[in-house]
């Protein structure tokens, strides 16, 4: 039974997240329904990142085992045909070794968070960026962000319902980049805790507003307490942009 690697783009707005849930539609569920329509039997689709409700992806990676070998391009096109008109697109499909695992074979995940730092309402970026009307000091945000780089106990920045066995994670990158009225927060790690990126972003916005200093952010990290976290940024601005493999 051949295994396929899929690269998937989606608008997470209408979904309860990647993972199948009882309380609403999911990206995983939509893909599995499409695969079942093609193959005539239940197909499990496993993703590299279990994105939350409202979070988007430019290049989510998933794998699935298909009972018969199909040309990768044909599988891609068939999945896209069955997914329409949902905001999910299968960008590529390729046959990979049987031991490839989209989640467990990944060595790094890359996310971008978009902040629209302007007074005007959003028009084209509704549900795709977080509008923060107060002018943010992006340089101060970037400087403070470097305090979070490295291996730390990120209890402060993880959801209270996070099921990870350990709060320890190694953060490889956390850059704050301004381009006109848009601020992009770019972050990379092997893996992240539940709500870690959005928790870090919300706290960095407090730094940008002048409510916190870099020392305050470092103190919040050191507190290892969820109550020490700043606000959690909304899911609208978060994108899974790349997953790395050996």
From Swiss-Prot:
Keywords: Isomerase, tRNA processing. It comes from the Bacteria. The keyword tRNA processing applies. One of its GO terms (biological process) is tRNA pseudouridine synthesis. Its EC number is 5.4.99.12. GO terms for molecular function: RNA binding; tRNA pseudouridine(38-40) synthase activity. Substrate binds at residue 111. It catalyses: uridine(38/39/40) in tRNA = pseudouridine(38/39/40) in tRNA. Pfam families: PseudoU_synth_1 (PF01416). NCBIfam families: hisT_truA. Homodimer. Belongs to the tRNA pseudouridine synthase TruA family. PANTHER family: PSEUDOURIDYLATE SYNTHASE, TRNA PSEUDOURIDINE SYNTHASE-LIKE 1. Formation of pseudouridine at positions 38, 39 and 40 in the anticodon stem and loop of transfer RNAs. This is tRNA pseudouridine synthase A. It comes from Rhodopseudomonas palustris (strain BisA53). The lineage of its organism: Bacteria, Pseudomonadati, Pseudomonadota, Alphaproteobacteria, Hyphomicrobiales.
């Amino acid at each position: 039974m051949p295994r396929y690697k899929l690269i998937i783009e989606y608008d997470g707005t209408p979904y309860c997240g990647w993972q199948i849930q009882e309380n609403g539609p999911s990206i995983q569920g939509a893909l599995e329904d499409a695969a079942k329509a093609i193959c005539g039997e239940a197909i499990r689709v496993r993703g590299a990142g279990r994105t939350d409700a409202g979070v988007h992806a430019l290049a989510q990676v998933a794998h699935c085992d298909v009972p018969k070998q199909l040309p990768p391009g044909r599988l891609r096109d068939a999945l896209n045909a069955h997914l329409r008109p949902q905001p999910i697109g299968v960008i590529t499909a390729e046959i990979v070794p049987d031991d490839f695992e989209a989640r467990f074979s990944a060595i790094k995940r890359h996310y971008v968070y978009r902040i629209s730092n302007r007074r005007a309402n959003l028009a084209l970026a509704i549900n795709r960026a977080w509008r923060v009307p107060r002018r943010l000091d992006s340089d101060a945000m970037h400087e403070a962000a470097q305090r979070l780089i490295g291996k730390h106990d990120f209890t402060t920045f993880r959801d209270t319902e996070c099921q990870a066995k350990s709060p320890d994670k190694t953060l490889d990158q956390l850059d704050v980049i301004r381009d006109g009225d848009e601020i992009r927060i770019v972050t990379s790690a092997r893996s992240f805790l539940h709500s870690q990126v959005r928790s870090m972003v919300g706290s960095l916005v407090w730094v940008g507003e002048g409510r916190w200093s870099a020392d305050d952010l470092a103190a919040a990290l050191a507190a290892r307490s969820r109550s020490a976290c700043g606000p959690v940024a909304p899911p609208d601005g978060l994108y899974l942009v790349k997953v790395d493999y050996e």
